[in-house]
Amino acid sequence: MFVVGQRWISESENNLGLGIVTASDNRTVTIQFPAAEEERIYALSVAPLTRVQFQKGDRINSVEGWQLDVEEVVENQGFIIYLGKRADSGEEAVLPEMQLDHKVSFSKPQDRLFSAQIDRSDRFALRYRALQHQQAQFQSPLRGMRGIRASLIPHQLHIAKEVGQRVAPRVLLADEVGLGKTIEAGMILQQQLFSGRVERVLVLVPESLQHQWLVEMLRRFNLKFSLFDEERCADFDKADEDGNDVSENPFDSEALVIASIDWLESSPNRAKQVLASNWDMLIVDEAHHLEWSENEPSVGYQFVERLSKQTSAVLLLTATPEQLGQESHFARLALLDADRFYDYNSFVAEQKDYKPVADAVATLLNDKPLSNDEQNSIADLLSEKDTEPMFKVINSEKSKENDRLQVRQELIRELIDRHGTSRVLFRNTRQGVKGFPHRVYHQITLEMPSQYTNALKVMGMMGGVTKDDQLYPERLFQRMNPAAKWADFDPRIEWLITFLKNHRDEKILVICKQADTAIALEQILREREAIRSAVFHEKMSIVERDRASAYFAQMEEGAQVLISSSIGSEGRNFQFASNLVLFNLPDNPDLLEQSIGRLDRIGQKNDIQIHVPCFENSMQMILATWYHQGLNAFEETCPMGAALFREFGEELEIFLKNPQAVGFDEFLAKTFKRQQHLKAELEQGRDRLLELNSNGGEAAQALAEAIAKEDNNPHLVNFALSLFDVIGLEQEDLGEQSIVISPTGHMLVPDFPGIAEDGTTVTFDRQLALMREDVEFLTWDHPMIRNGIDLITSGYIGKSAISLLINKNLPAGTLLLEAIYMVETQAPKGLNLTRFLPPTPVRILLDNKGNDMAAQVSFAGLEKQLKPLNKQMANKIAKMAQADIKKLIGISEQKIAAKLPELIEKASQDADSTLSAELHRLTSLQAVNKNIRSDEIEALEQQRIESLKQIALANWRLDSLRVIVSNKE
């Protein structure tokens, strides 16, 4: 059936152009689409492909640009050869199908009309609206940011927009913990995916954060990443009969991959496979663990360095400021731009030069006069500007307040553009971002039960007491006494029950170390005390966790308490609760902050009450006291926690193993003194200029407001409900702004993506979606809406229709033709030309004399006057009026051909204006800021040239048509 070299088109992806068969076997066929620089592999049984065969009388284009008027079609061994005359010279010519223009597009609604494949008029209307919405969404500046299941936080949106719209972004996201670096990275990634600049993404994280990333990417962005570990990769290891390695690269099997950097550091073979796979974007979380020194970079650093050199887009995430390790900070920046950050000493000197400028900015922000030193620092940096008049306005008491404000803002903008690392480094601090609650610590001291004391004593005599045994004695006891139940005597349970009863009207999150502990606790609360509770752990599926989360989120009939394992809660935030019980204490400061971070988020309305029940004179008590009095980690975020843990870890271990040891108070005082010293260093080293650039100011606030206006958009709601109806999905309104969408037996497609067998609950309301993770949040960016639009626009739904127009002013039987043409380019996705010329529907409405009335008669206005026709009558009209319809189609082609140059000109102007402005801005900045990469400017210039070239090649095709016949009644 398929022969290498034959030409086929994709029925589901018309925009790919004309394909060439490059390979075929018993099960699959491979098609190359040169126009779009894409390749597809189809299963033979369900390949959505149509053989391309032109007929006598057709005019066809060659790949060399000349046209042939076909006079004869010859087939030879599966290949087609076209014979005819060249349109330009009239000479006889031969055109084998291999030489056909790759940019041919096929979609002939007239063929369907005349072959009795006539659709309902309301489906034609839905198709046109889908095309209009598709065009609008391609051009929306909010695309890739509005669909996130998260609150609209201005600084996050600012960073996402600033970075997400760059070509090959390479940045360091260094917001303090709790400010949403993962969300920023996700929005940047989403924009890059939507624009087509990125397809294959690798996320490297510490092992403990793998599930958090997996869950956050799915629940917040609808991105289905795959988790790669040794077990998964082992399935790809193969050897032939002779024992030769014929393994496939496992990392080539998925486009979106999450892997543990710890695992890859310890597995050179897997690291080699990662390097052998081609990635478009690399994201590294907890990048401060990549240790570097000039003479001895760590294995992890060297691995990421090699990856970053062969990957165009790189995002590094770290919460550790450079003051805790200037060398490592320099090394992370070098991963992003080795040419710019090539010498550590030069970097240190340059950073020192910016310190006085940052101080001057603080003065500007506080609306105070600038000192002479501050004026000199600013003048040195803005050497090409005459700053003297600006200083006079700022320092003069006679200046109007509004004038001072304008000059201050202009100066700050100029300084931001010249900041040494402001283009590659973004950092927001809690001091700079308002809206965080206080944290209040409550330590509950309980007597350790004799059962635990005895178990620890016996295990100690056997020489096998571990740190985990002492921190979590319930697990040790259960291991030694499988028939008994630790929950029958543990005083923490009685305390928890009493606490819950005293706070019946409050939501409480309880975090345990292990899933088994969480399961046992929840069972006791539910069965013994009839307390409404839910459990949440890593052994549950994501759907089960969503349901538990939704039950906890319900205000009236929901669970009072959610009991979660520490791993189970990763990636979940419950800011509607303000009480946290740490049933088991995390064993390092980072994990402690992660646990508190489940509640301590922007949007938390109340102070967070942190309750820690622990046994007297135990390892738990020592650790809790050190966290509180040494690090102050319960009541404040502690960015230096990990560094202090490393610095004092060995000494802490002495007191953990022997809680009675002398000198603990002195140790606490020493830790706290060091913590205060580092905290002061951090505060002193705060770069106000960098924070200002990272914050986004009023523009970021305006961006958040613009997205908020799109939430619950009535156009989206109406379109989505019509879409679900046409697809054949059942809709049940649940009230409270949610709907259940369920599959039926009469759907257009057997399996619509995103719809579960038992139905899926959806909402258009962001706040409800934040409360209920089991509810899908529908926006224009959601896969359900995007897939629905693709289903309508790329298939045959609504391509041809015939309707009755009830109008007493027109003679009965008057024929009108409504033609929808698409103007589009067939260019590589990476150019992101849809910003300037998306697939654009152009409506032409012809009367029986060929006059275009589209401007006078609106689509919506006409739609109200139309009545449906039964299929038999529609077919009869199509046959009777075939000649007139063909004549009107010919006239409509002349009309669209006349409109095309204007559309191309406007798109070219938009592209040239946008890309030239960005090019000019970067070129100007490069003269005063070394951080502007030359390769970025070169790529942008190349993009501008190629974009204008491809837009000039835009063409039109007839997408759909509706024949309208008038009647008096």
From Swiss-Prot:
Ranges where the Helicase C-terminal domain occurs: 492-663
GO biological process: regulation of DNA-templated transcription
Flavoprotein in keyword set: no
InterPro entries, sorted: Helicase_ATP-bd, Helicase_C-like, Helicase_RapA, P-loop_NTPase, RapA_C, SNF2-like_sf, SNF2/RAD54-like_C, SNF2_N
Binding locations of ATP: D175, E176, V177, G178, L179, G180, K181, T182
Keyword ATP-binding: yes
Alphabetical UniProt keywords: Activator, ATP-binding, DNA-binding, Helicase, Hydrolase, Nucleotide-binding, Transcription, Transcription regulation
MF terms in GO: ATP binding; DNA binding; helicase activity; hydrolase activity, acting on acid anhydrides
Subunit structure as annotated in this protein's UniProt entry: Interacts with the RNAP. Has a higher affinity for the core RNAP than for the holoenzyme. Its ATPase activity is stimulated by binding to RNAP.
Function text: Transcription regulator that activates transcription by stimulating RNA polymerase (RNAP) recycling in case of stress conditions such as supercoiled DNA or high salt concentrations. Probably acts by releasing the RNAP, when it is trapped or immobilized on tightly supercoiled DNA. Does not activate transcription on linear DNA. Probably not involved in DNA repair.
Protein name according to UniProt: RNA polymerase-associated protein RapA
Organism of provenance: Actinobacillus pleuropneumoniae serotype 3 (strain JL03)
Gene (name only): rapA
